[in-house]
Amino acid sequence: MKTSDNERIKYEITGQAVLQILRMKINFSLQTLIKQLLVMKSAEEDAFRRDLIDSIIRDFSNSDSGGPNRRTATADNKSMFNGKKINRIH
């Protein structure tokens, strides 16, 4: 399979994980996304897709450069992109 096909499938899987988290109406964080991907991996029957999910988890785990003192999802309401406060809608 082409790399572009793999990337497309990885985006699809990531999107499915994000949508599932949003449906559960829980706070979204990188940790939550990784946990949802692990749940999806355990339920996946296709070995190729399991490998892709592993790859996605590694990508997200490596992008979390916070080191051992990582903030938890509930530590603050600041965007990881610009540090501005996020207004939460409940």
UniProtKB/Swiss-Prot annotation:
One of its GO terms (biological process) is negative regulation of single-species biofilm formation. Residues 63-80 have a biased composition (Polar residues). Induction: Induced by 5-fluorouracil. Strongly induced at 16 degrees Celsius. Expression is dependent on RpoS, repressed by YcgE. At 16 degrees Celsius with blue light irradiation, expression of this operon is absolutely dependent on YcgF for relief from YcgE repression. Part of the ycgZ-ymgA-ariR-ymgC operon. Residues 63-90 are annotated as: Disordered. Probably a connector protein for RcsB/C regulation of biofilm formation, providing additional signal input into the two-component signaling pathway. May serve to stimulate biofilm maturation, probably via the Rcs phosphorelay. Mild overexpression at 16 degrees Celsius increases the production of colanic acid, an exopolysaccharide and matrix component, and reduces adhesive curli fimbriae expression. Both of these effects require RcsB. This is Probable two-component-system connector protein YmgA. The gene is ymgA.
